[in-house]
Amino acid sequence: MSYYPYYQTENSDYSSFNSLMADICEPSPSSSSSRKRPADSENGNSAKMPVVIPMQPVQNFTMQYPIDNGWQNFNMIHQVYNNNNMNQPGYGWVGQPPPMPQDFYKARPGQTVTPPMNEFHNAHGTQQTPNDNSGNLPISSVMYTPESDLSTTSANFTPDWNTTTNGPCNQEKRNKENLFPNDDTSSGKLFDYFLTNTERENESENNIPHPYNKAVFPTFGVPVSSDGNVVAEVVDGRLPAVGTRSKYDLTVDELRRRCGAPEHMNQSALYCFFRKSKKKEAINRVKKVLTDYNITVRTMQRQRKVTCFSPFLEEEATALARDLDSITEEFLPIDAIALEMLEKLIFNNKNLDICLRILKNTNKTITRVIKTLEVRQPKITGQKEKLKGNSLDLSYHNFSLTTHGFGHPNSLSHYRSYQKIVEQAALYCEKMQKGASLPSKEYLIPGQKPFENMSNEFFVEWRMRSYHKKARKEMLDFNQAYSRSS
């Protein structure tokens, strides 16, 4: 009984291994789909034709193997080895085909030879050639043919002991025989591009491989001439301070970023971005800027994601991030949040040792996140771009592009605030371990507004703390200005 019931062998000719490989490598120009079946004869005897088995589409797992090295595609559904239909629709490479052991077996002349097939020998997801294992031990697994298991008792194949008795070959011999040598020192391996570790985070930008090298692929866009810092227009800000009118420079580089991914601004959005009305003079002005600097706006760019950041220029967005950072540093109640966090941990039946361990581990995690973001700088107006050559670059730069440069400094500001809270909570925990008590706090009545139940002593302490913080900052600024002048 055949191991491959769907493999038709009535019309197969395995007279020699070379002829079989010739048929595989150079299939007949007339495909099975172009041949017509002869009409049935009147007496009911139909013409005998090779049976064509319908093939179902397989999973899209494309792995090409060179046919001249003995590879064939293995069809998992019909359990056959062939590549005559590899270029037809619905056919493809399925899995890893077993290697053809050309070095181990030599066909005896003058005898019918069935091509040797090793049952899934070394069937891994890496690309191999028949010569990969030529210096190792002889193949000891059972050999199979498409018809039946005949190779264990067949005398058609004789081991080539001149090859197999030489022992394991050295690396120099393996590199000579291997048609696909692996260069372990090369930086072109795919996983190197997406390797996220401390060494790659701290390496210089000159060592970044090709796809992420900013000299080759700046800001994941089309390389252009050095006109990026040219001011295309001076426009008013969207969030001017009270009593002032802020103006910001719209550079050519920023205009290219707005017209590219992920926003793809169309001309209607650019009119708002330029703070221009849709009058003829304003329309011509915007079109002239786009034409002068060779910026293409596709007519299909109609469906885009509009956010509150869409009308902001990058200078204004980063100024907003700086103001938010200074407000957070001044008014965020770090001590009160840290005290609340520690009380919650103790309330959940955690002793001080466990609380301190949790807080220190959390601090390490936040520190790692901050370092990961600090070594990067998405391209915005007035900032030099920094890429690190892994998978975070593209997604994080898209985040920065969508927020017009606001996302990166704002994220760093938030994580640094979280770190201060955790560090202060750990400091309170260490003081409690030494016998100190937690600072007292005043509890508000539910539904009562802040400051309504605040005592006079606490209010004075709160105001004095703010005053001392402001005085220290002014003194620091004065010392820095004095040192620069001297």
From Swiss-Prot:
Annotated family: Belongs to the AP-2 family.
Lineage, uppermost ranks: Eukaryota, Metazoa, Ecdysozoa, Nematoda, Chromadorea
Subunit structure: Binds DNA as a dimer.
GO cellular component, one term: nucleus
Annotated GO MF terms: DNA-binding transcription activator activity, RNA polymerase II-specific; RNA polymerase II transcription regulatory region sequence-specific DNA binding; sequence-specific DNA binding
PANTHER family: TRANSCRIPTION FACTOR AP-2, TRANSCRIPTION FACTOR AP-2 C-TERMINAL DOMAIN-CONTAINING PROTEIN-RELATED
Function field: Sequence-specific DNA-binding protein that interacts with enhancer elements to regulate transcription of selected genes. Required for neuroblast and epidermal morphogenesis, perhaps acting in cooperation with transcription factor aptf-2.
Signal peptide positions (record): none
GO biological process terms, semicolon-separated: positive regulation of transcription by RNA polymerase II; regulation of cell population proliferation
Pfam families with a match to the protein in the record: TF_AP-2
Protein's name in the database: Transcription factor aptf-4
Organism: Caenorhabditis elegans
Plastid listed as a keyword: no
Gene ablation phenotype (knockout): RNAi-mediated knockdown causes embryonic lethality and morphological defects in larva. Embryonic lethality is exacerbated on the transcription factor aptf-2 mutant background.
